[in-house]
């Protein structure tokens, strides 16, 4: 006998397996109510932003999430110094972090994506996130552990229901268990913290975020995939320092598929707070693999430590500053430098030099006592090839081959660790947060993004080199896997294509344009002895012009393209000049572009006991 549950057809044996997993997940397992000490995306950190901008608190750790000792100290300060609205929010979180050390939670959700040109209703994505989560503290919070242990379950691929360039909010990506049409993923995060509020160590498996732009950082993005982290932080009135060493996942260099171990990220940042209205930060990150390197655990400049290993790792540097000209108002800027040819800049100018850089600047305003709790306006630009990096078969050769893993690009499990937008993009974003009544939280957003495939700007010779390579060697989709280096077996590093020495920022003929307008709301009922219920609903309108820009333009054809000499090539039993062959593939890529309008709907019910 077979029975349908939420549109999923299950036979008797599978039903028994389904309910067994469901029962176990309620007892032991994460997803719905992530803990403040585990999840850097929790609303708590937006509240901290407001409290800091208005001068209620002065010293917060540079890395999110915070240890329980810091969270409690922040909440106590706000309860003592804040207005009625601040106190109400702080007390709500105080109950969470000082309550019982475990909570059983579950979230049931439904998502629907509707293409405006499609007449049928389409299929609904049903999701279930059962969990156990909580905080454990010892020795007056000198030792604390936050945990969020559970399952993420879907009846369809979640990637098909996300807006363009959006990261999934859950760490459920691989090693699924199929129960009929239901895909179940293990999802666990935990953070162990040891120390006092001004100096501490954290370790565990969790997402981490850095910088003034929550969920949109250029170096460590709060909504990127989780990592195994070990960090040290010290927070002082005039300066702070943090250092994090992370184990991450390497994926195929061509498309970010599959996964392999032995890839690492090291990050550290030093912030100076000269006056209450101004702070300045310098940070470095470095990606490396196939070895453990203790030199990146030391508080020394990575640009110096890298020299010991021969400059084979992927180093980035950044500068950030925050200006608070008025209570509740912040102007923040973050400059992330991946690769910048300084000599070329002075010799040839900015338009004719290698400049792999990301910049984000914006204004954030958090009124003191208003139902509008946050207003933000920011602009982001990512130059071509930012975050990309080639890897080689081994450290003795510049050979790049089909199917190899990349241990050097700025991804974890194939997901960008910085901005979620691809290189050669810019984005303007406006957001509003409202709390008209305390249990109701409303968020409104409006964004406009442009993206170009850098391969529209390369030369015919460079395009032919891509086409004549083996399939799976080079990506030409203009994304984070599309680096500018070609294989160089006779050297120790690849050869950069000449076009990468020109800026070419959004100068392509066929740009992708994305407009998004959205609204979401969440309402929580009063907490009772039997638990608490929360409801959420959201809608997003998305307009895309030239969808498909981010697809391969010059896929490798290997021996299918024959060089007949004199600038003539044979492909598919036809002869072409070099320029005609390039035009053939470029025109095929252009023919695949389309305009699209999408509507995204989601509803959710959360329960916590």
Where are these regions (language model features)?
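Boundary at the C-terminal end of the N-terminal hydrophobic targeting segment
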Residues: 32-34
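Positively charged n-region of N-terminal signal peptides that target proteins for export
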Residues: 2-4, 12-18
